[in-house]
Every structure is written in structure tokens, then in C-alpha cells.
Amino acid sequence: MSVCAVLLLCVAGLLCLSSACYIQNCPRGGKRALLEPVSRQCLACGPGDKGRCLGPSICCGEEIGCLVGSPWMARCQEEEYLPSPCQTAGKLCGSDAGPCAAPGVCCGTEGCKLDPNCSEDSESEEPADQNTLGASPGELLLRLLHPNNRKHNQY
């Protein structure tokens, strides 16, 4: 082989092994755009799109409470197929730093649970078994998970 052929093969080999951004495979925003994931708001869900998806089967909002496993969750299934992660609004709570999904409810990777840090007035002192609505935490969670009963049950 001639020196030109060997040199050409070496250059071709280096081009194949390099991690440069070429015209064919360059992502939008350039090579460094992959380092900074774009955060977006989670998809809207629930009646009147008043909630946000917190998982494939959880939809929570201040006005609707938390809906788990209801027909309104079809939109939340789409979240898994979107390329960028979503970010929920609200302060972080719980052991896995999930978001406050609704007043008094913290949702994380393992599901949702009652959390006094998520109440609207978390600075006020309340007895552990009663809240300002006059219901036990269990009753409050049931009311949040079943918002259709709100018309009949007044706080």
C-alpha cells in the first residue's frame, strides 16, 4: 500500500472514533445542548385540565384534589413517551423530595401520602389528629381523592 492510502485510512478511522458533532447527527442547539435538559411543565389532566400529571396514573390539582387511576389519566400515559422530563410546580416534600400535589398531600415516586408541610398554612400549629377543616387526616385524604363528593360534604 502506498503512504497516501495508509494516511487516508488513518484519517477515516479517526473520524469514525471521534465524538464530534457532524452535520448528519448534530442535535438541535449543538453538541452541548444535550448537557442541559429542558424542563417543562407536566401535562395538564383532570376535569377541565385543572390538574397536572404526577405519574402515569396520578393527577393532582388544588381545585380537584388527587385523582388516582381514573379515566382522566389517559393523558398522563403520554408523559412517559415525551423526550424531556417534566417539572411540577409547588414546594418539595417527603423523604424522596416529591412535590406538594394538593393541600395536605405530598406525591413521590412511591405514591401519595398526607403531609402537613403541604398544607396551605403549614406554619400554623394544629393538633396532630385534627386539621383546620375539622376532619381527621384519613377523612381529608378521602375527600381529596374523591372530589365528586365535595358537593355533598361541606368542610
Swiss-Prot record:
Residues 119-139 are annotated as: Disordered. Residues 119-128 have a biased composition (Acidic residues). GO terms for molecular function: neurohypophyseal hormone activity. The modification Glycine amide is found at residue 29. It is found in: Secreted. Keywords: Amidation, Cleavage on pair of basic residues, Disulfide bond, Hormone, Secreted, Signal. Vasotocin is an antidiuretic hormone. This is Vasotocin-neurophysin VT 2.
